[in-house]
A protein has these predicted regions:
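Short strand-edge motifs at loop-to-beta-strand transitions and within beta-strands
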Residues: 49-53, 83-85
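Surface-exposed loops/turns
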Residues: 7, 47, 56-58, 79
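A short, solvent-exposed beta-strand micro-motif common in secreted/extracellular proteins
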Residues: 58-68
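Structured interaction patches on ligand/partner-binding surfaces of diverse proteins
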Residues: 67-90
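Hydrophobic beta-strand segments
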Residues: 28-32, 62
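Structural motif
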Residues: 14-26
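Short, acidic Ser/Thr/Gly-rich low-complexity loop/linker segments typical of extracellular
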Residues: 35-50
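Beta-strand-rich domain onsets/edges
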Residues: 1-12, 21
């Protein structure tokens, strides 16, 4: 996490994209969708499947798209801090 990030004020959603065996899936596109399924942001997962978004508290859907498959996960951060969630693709 960058030193300039104030975890007492920032809401960070972070995690990994994994396959059905729990192995990391690098290079997947990870989309952040709001509570009405509207596209908000997209990042490319690192070679180790890691991703990170800065978001507001609320309900979010993470959607991973890759050649190995697709998957969704829901996270509902209630406040500032790091909120971890893995997205499993099938």
């Amino acid at each position: 996490m960058p030193a300039s990030v104030d975890l007492e004020k920032e809401t960070v959603i972070t995690g990994r994209v994994v396959d059905r065996d729990g192995q990391a899936v690098g290079g997947a596109f990870v989309r952040l969708l709001d509570s009405s399924d509207e596209f908000t942001a997209e990042v490319v997962a690192s070679a180790t499947g890691d991703f990170r978004f800065f978001a507001a508290p609320g309900s979010w859907t993470l959607r991973a798209l890759s050649a190995a498959g697709n998957g969704d996960a829901v996270v509902t951060p209630s406040g500032a801090g790091i909120h971890e969630v893995d997205v499993k693709i099938t």
